[in-house]
Amino acid sequence: MSPPRPESEAELKKIEKNERRRKSYKAKREASSYQKIKDEIPEIPGWLMSNQLGKQLEASDKFTMLVEKGEISVIDEVINQGGVPVLVEFLATGDTAELRLIAAQSLANIARGNLVQTQVIIDQNGIPPLVYRLGTGNDEIREMAICALSNISYHSTHTREAVIDSGAFLELWKLLKQPFEPRLTILTKASLALANFCRGEPPNKTVFNQIRQNMPVLKQLLLMTDKQVATNACTTFSLIASKADMIQAVDEAQICARMIELIKKPMPECFEPALLTLAEIAAQNHVSAQAVISAGLVFALVNSTRAESDFRKDAAQAILNITNNGSPEQILSLVNDGCIPPLCALLTCADPMTVCICLNGLRNILRADQARKGMVEECGGMEKIAVLQHNENTDARDIAVEILEGFWPEKIDWDHYLN
């Protein structure tokens, strides 16, 4: 039976007033509780290092909450009071699983801080016991160890190499090669760690060689239905696709359709890495370009015109790469799919690099088939290009003038240039 409806406007106002009071009280109570925990920051390191499991568990929970809310000062408290070597010892030789879990979680939290704070873990030889816990112990400890190693590797090439050189990647790779055996939360953390191992310059040869030799493993992660795992795999593909010795393996993995699918869902987290990957594949050769076209690249471009500027630029770059390297038939296919209207629409965006990419794409299309002038005019592209000949950005201005000279010379403002 549904609850009775308010009988009068006065009753409705009273209900709304009480709801506002309830929310206000809840917010004040949460703020008061949080402030109390902040006041305990100087005590948390001592509780973590005590011999009382209850205190250690409480301190670990509070430590995690404070770090998640950006209270990085608590990390300095733990470091300054000598907590890191104690936590490393707990992780390596702790008597109970609870104690080892507390240690792994605390080290993961410290690695969420800055590079200087993370370096303390490395200096205190904290990486080896974290790697050891990847292959032993319960799933919760393994998950926290993965988090810690992932966080450490994210900070710099130096910290990444320290993690990989310790054997972390090979242990992690074992988990990823059997994606249906670990629980999903472990797979989520492991796929994120893999992406972090692929960041930075120069790339780590061991990681890239293993991925290249076992590309189906990464593709399997990309095909998974879990949103976060797929996003992490998509990010990894974007990081390796930009490398000359990896792009062929990425191309041969035949992932274009899946990348477009992730964009269509839509999954905003995947927009940028998916488009970056497609742009790299499209730049390879005619066969690769056709795979990207057939997957529905123009849809991604049209969809991106309503997205953030970075996404629009990446989608336009993929189109440009095909117009640079594709056959006349492939360029015609892009046109028939409807690429001209979104390219013209993006000529007025605020980002000059995106504008230049779109201008170059339109120039290539017109060079391939001058008969497409009418389509550009219908979309307002000609007028926008004419306006761009006065743009403050030198590159955009020069490309616009070149297009006008070749296809609409009557639109060039000669008085402006002669004066």
List PLM regions with ranges:
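Register-specific detector for alpha-helical tandem repeat solenoids, activating on a conserved position
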Residues: 76, 88, 108, 119, ...
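HEAT/HEAT-like alpha-solenoid repeats
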Residues: 42-49, 53, 85-95, 128-135, ...
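Intrinsically disordered, low-complexity regulatory regions
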Residues: 1-65, 382-419
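Alpha-helical scaffold repeats of the Armadillo/HEAT/TPR superfamily
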Residues: 40, 78-86, 121-129, 163-172, ...
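Alpha-helical solenoid repeats of the armadillo/HEAT superfamily
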Residues: 51-65, 95-111, 136-154, 165-166, ...
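Alpha-helical solenoid scaffolds in large eukaryotic transport, assembly, and signaling factors
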Residues: 17-37, 46, 50-89, 97, ...
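Flexible helix-coil junctions and inter-repeat linker/turn elements that act as hinges
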Residues: 69-73, 83-84, 112-117, 126-127, ...
